[in-house]
Amino acid sequence: MKSFIVLAVTLCLAAFFMGQSVASPAAAAEESKFVDGLHALKTIEPELHGRYKRATCDLLSGTGINHSACAAHCLLRGNRGGYCNGKAVCVCRN
């Protein structure tokens, strides 16, 4: 009885792993679209990242530190400071 259970488990595992080794047609189609190396860098479109100029003044306006955060942002960029204008946009001084 013990050897029968071991044989049954072994056959089940073998069947499971045999089924996993067969590649599906969808995976083969995805691999055909794969581009490798330098050619990939030339063909891949760059990701678009939005620039949110109002993040410093808008997000921190409720805490009361919006002008300080804008000034710190401008100092990190190498300017003499900055302020938040009426449209909640950080304006850096030269």
Curated annotation (Swiss-Prot):
Protein function: Sapecins, which are potent bactericidal proteins, are produced in response to injury. Sapecin is cytotoxic to Gram-positive bacteria, and to a lesser extent against Gram-negative bacteria.
Known tissue expression: Hemocytes and fat body.
Keyword Disulfide bond listed: yes
PROSITE patterns linked to this entry: INVERT_DEFENSINS
GO aspect biological process, one term: humoral immune response
Protein name: Sapecin
Cleaved propeptide residues: 24-54
Signal peptide residues on this chain, from the entry's feature table: 1-23
Family listed: Belongs to the invertebrate defensin family. Type 1 subfamily.
PANTHER family in UniProt: DEFENSIN
UniProt keyword annotations, A-Z: Antibiotic, Antimicrobial, Cleavage on pair of basic residues, Defensin, Disulfide bond, Immunity, Innate immunity, Secreted, Signal
Coiled-coil regions listed in the entry: none
GO cellular component, one term: extracellular space
Cellular localization per UniProt: Secreted
Disulfide bonds: C57-C84, C70-C90, C74-C92
